[in-house]
């Protein structure tokens, strides 16, 4: 094959990846989307000169197709911050480096071996793990997320999390690739029909066995028979670029109350409102002085059981002289600092000595709610999105905080971007959360695939934890999600709405909740180990060649 054919084959990979992520409706395409990349890598490896064990060309063949995929699926992030224009280019470069590193290890440990492609799965899993934990955390395109609109096919995420989906996708691609090789490469063609049939059977099994197991679990799963709670979800539909910050806090509360009153009754346990719903910027040490909280408490007390949970922008005063990464100084006192925060608050019903609970958003959006590598990139702060006064790095909690009431189940409240991190949501459940509420403000991305993908991810969090979810979006998609990941009562984009449903709290802990991202952790460890060993092997081979050269 010449360069043009190899380039077209690799471009096919980019097209397939983009198609699979097109509103996540064609997710099964992911099971073959990396086959073109493996074909190109195999051809390059088979045609390398004897003196050159690896080639940098593979990076170049990967970059443009991966850029196409990243651009077509995440272009909408640029609506929230101009810095995100660079995101697809950086992401594509990082992914191409991952593919190149896998090629490097494959050539070191398993040249021309069928099992050598396992390094692609290993390094991609390690890359996804990195994307969950470094400063530029962007796990959006973690491969396992692609099946979020097919919860019936990934019920086993309760054991593996999204990492299991990524591993499955790579195993399917590897099996299909070996089948394709039987028709593409001469050496494999000569092995005959029996060899082809074996690979056909293997590819079929790798694809269908996990799907079959998942479907059996889908149809046989039963929720625990616990006492249900009634949840009302409010979608006020405030334009985040104008209404939400142009309206007075009282006007915002009036809209919330007007909608909630349509569904709330004497049996209502929770009224869930979206992220950044309250805009008083109250001091957290004096939270009850917030006019919005007092106003909503008056409404809350009209219903005997109701508790209101809402998102709020707040300020946290730091002890004298203490300065954190998110600290901001007072103009008149350079030794006093405070943090701006994005919080969820559970409004206390007690009107005499109220003690409302709160927690801080802790998985922050890069370049919007935190400045990654602040000591180096701090000068870019002016390009970050101004979230109505909370621009820059926000204060956060060191660990997950669960809301508890005497007569109600413990609840987890995930704020927007936090719902993309399965292990973090699992930490709430491990601490006793029996229900999950997701509050978000997806209007920043406008009417793009972004808000639909974000809503779909809630299904994966439900499967991983086996918890029912109520999702409140300022605008976007508000809905309820069963522990099987099945969504209901979905609202339309850019419309005011209120929905109500009975949810059954669940108490059992899944294997994934108990053990977290064990697949990611193991993959990261082995990826680093094999890469370092490959480097050592490469140096030793060069040294041996120098020794045997004639003087």
Predicted stretch roles:
Residues 1-218, 446-447, 473, 488, ...:
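Membrane-embedded alpha-helical bundles of multi-pass enzymes
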Residues 2-5, 205-266, 429, 441-454, ...:
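Non-cytosolic juxtamembrane linkers/loops
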Residues 77-80, 130-162, 329-422:
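Active-site catalytic loop in hydrolytic enzyme cores
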Residues 95, 121-122, 270, 276-278, ...:
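CN hydrolase (nitrilase-like) catalytic-core segments centered on the catalytic cysteine
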Residues 151, 226, 303, 332, ...:
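A generic fold-level signal
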